[in-house]
């Protein structure tokens, strides 16, 4: 990780230690410098994010790749974060970092499209290599997720806010994250994921759950029991009853296939 990225994070972490969302008063000076409006990103999301009957949103990467106008709009949106003050621990900055992460990820896929997975061409993935200017420094996707969002906010909601362009990732929403509705939107995202088979599948042996709950177990309480307790917070009554009947995690699962809208078209019969 570049030293400049770590220095930015170290300063932010010292000033704003990890805790829950919006548990510190917003600082007006920082708020005024943050891109408050995410209308351009919302327009792009509404245009290119496609809902499906299986509950997973897909992205029309081919359509976006073909539109120079919208690719330019995406670039312009991302550039707005270059010199913004994003250090304060506020809902507005959580939304800003999450939106930026998702926008940069979508741009990365579009620039390399067609691909079958975000990991194509990489040993483990592009997250340390894909960088963007934000908050006055160059930061990678890896730094945004692990050194900024997880470190400063320290809440499980981070994992429902960012999208890795993959089938098993929590959905990319069809609108930008906004401070005013952040809590309810993150709650809805968590419920949608946990109540979908890619989040939790109940078997006769126990629970098959997303690898997210393995990779980031510490963020969900630090043990399998705490992970199960987290799942029960969001599980619908029928699923919750099944989880309680056999609350043992027996398998982790993850599908890195690209969340590509083109796959939906192939499943439609003429």
Where are these regions (language model features)?
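Bacterial N-terminal signal peptides
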Residues: 7-16
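Interaction/scaffold regions that mediate signaling and macromolecular assembly across diverse proteins
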Residues: 23-99, 103-270
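Sec/Tat signal peptide C-region and signal peptidase I cleavage site
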Residues: 18-21
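Positively charged n-region of N-terminal signal peptides that target proteins for export
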Residues: 1-4
